[in-house]
A protein has these predicted regions:
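Terminal, non-globular segments
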Residues: 1-167
Length: 167
């Protein structure tokens, strides 16, 4: 498990840099803000200790907040999905197909289960993030939540296929 922790802290640095230096700087449209860093929370094994999952989620969100000047919005949304991840996995991921330290990837759980699991977490993240950020809800924010969630899912799938194509 210690190797896993070390791996994920290295990935945290890489994904934070990608998010800050590339994704936050590219203007997709007024309605699309993709967030790749939440892939780290999605991929963590189901048997990850809760203390690590929540602490790691806070660190992920904190670093994005720190470099984006976003006052804790990302930390809040990321800790929320980390907290909900075990419950959502029980509903969306078939039982007994993952080993104790298996990462949650399409090759392990299947594309249908992965899309369902990942989209629910991504949607909850974006919903909470944009509602907290805007402190209101209207049609434009709904479009922003849905479009950002879909684009984030596509970017996450592409990234995952790139990293795990040979496994």
């Amino acid at each position: 498990m210690n190797k896993l922790y070390l791996k994920y802290f290295k990935l945290l640095i890489i994904f934070t840099m990608i998010q800050i230096l590339i994704l936050n700087e590219v203007m997709f449209s007024a309605y699309i803000n993709p967030f790749l860093y939440i892939l780290l929370i999605i991929m963590l094994p189901l048997k990850t200790p809760k203390w690590f999952l929540l602490t790691y989620a806070f660190c992920c969100g904190f670093f994005i907040d720190l470099f984006s000047s976003s006052l804790g919005f990302h930390s809040t949304a990321t800790v929320l999905i980390a907290f909900l991840k075990p419950s959502i996995s029980k509903i969306t991921i078939p039982h007994n197909i993952l080993g104790e330290n298996d990462e949650i990837i399409t090759h392990k759980i299947g594309i249908k289960a992965y899309l369902t699991f990942a989209f629910i977490l991504i949607f909850i993240h974006h919903l909470s993030l944009f509602l907290i950020e805007h402190l209101s809800f209207n049609f434009n924010i709904l479009i922003k939540i849905i479009s950002s969630s879909l684009i984030s899912l596509i970017i996450i799938l592409i990234t995952q296929q790139f990293f795990y194509r040979n496994k």
